Curated annotation (Swiss-Prot):
Annotated disulfide bonds: 279-285
Functional note: Endo-1,4-beta-xylanase involved in the hydrolysis of xylan, a major structural heterogeneous polysaccharide found in plant biomass representing the second most abundant polysaccharide in the biosphere, after cellulose.
Full protein name: Endo-1,4-beta-xylanase C
Induction line: Expressed in presence of xylan and repressed by glucose.
Gene Ontology CC entries for this record: extracellular region
Catalytic residue list: 155 (proton donor), 261 (nucleophile)
Organism: Aspergillus fumigatus (strain ATCC MYA-4609 / CBS 101355 / FGSC A1100 / Af293)
Localization terms from the record: Secreted
Gene Ontology terms, MF aspect: endo-1,4-beta-xylanase activity
Enzyme Commission designation: 3.2.1.8
Amino acid sequence: MVVLSKLVSSILFVSLVSAGVIEERQAASINQAFTSHGKKYFGTASDQALLQKSQNEAIVRKDFGQLTPENSMKWDATEPSQGRFNFAGADFLVNYAKQNGKKVRGHTLVWHSQLPSWVSAISDKNTLTSVLKNHITTVMTRYKGQIYAWDVVNEIFNEDGSLRDSVFSRVLGEDFVRIAFETARSVDPSAKLYINDYNLDSASYGKTQGMVRYVKKWLAAGIPIDGIGTQTHLGAGASSSVKGALTALASSGVSEVAITELDIAGASSQDYVNVVKACLDVPKCVGITVWGVSDRDSWRSGSSPLLFDSNYQPKAAYNAIIAAL
């Protein structure tokens, strides 16, 4: 009985220690830890359905300081038919952010994907210019003063660094970039205006070099681009080149860069810590957004790329980031 009593006591002690570890994690906030180093936010992607899922929302409220709407601000959601706007989903996210003290990154105003067919069918230059200006003006006016940064144009480059073929580039040439950014600046001068893309994870890669080359040219022409967003959807073990890539993007002359859609196949602690340290080490890197909370809701769920597992439990990478900060 004495042995059993000691065993029970030992189990109780271990349980209390474990509870202490859990409580320590719950007391930490990845956003607070990150911003204590002078950065602006550590955020995540979400939307109404996820914010109404209690386990997901609790983590968002506690751990993240910024929200990016995963789909509710894209063109097919906000203006599915010409001149008829729907802001229900976007309103929900922005209102939640205001009530809970979160910054918002608007995502996205001009993108070739999730684009209504009525826009894709436009072939007249004046018509597309008018449609583009009206869309940007209407969406940005609704949230004026409430959005920290906007992804004004998204994924406009090919892998070799040339401009992607889209209705915007076909009809307007690269001038659609000027039209979009100048319109955005006129509507909300306080918002940071970004160009955002994926596969900008190595300084030597063609798309990264193309982004830097074009942004330098556009800035020299007076186009008001404040920042470059690098989505940073990484494969396992691909984190070591991120710091160099961020440095290259920052060299374009923009005032800031950000990691905007981070997820990493396998979610290894080393990969996540490498990316966080890369942003910390690059002065112009203002923040990191992970592309979701739980693997359950990830667009790459098969590769378990996020900081929380499918049961909303923190992974080793989460704790490694907290420890590194």
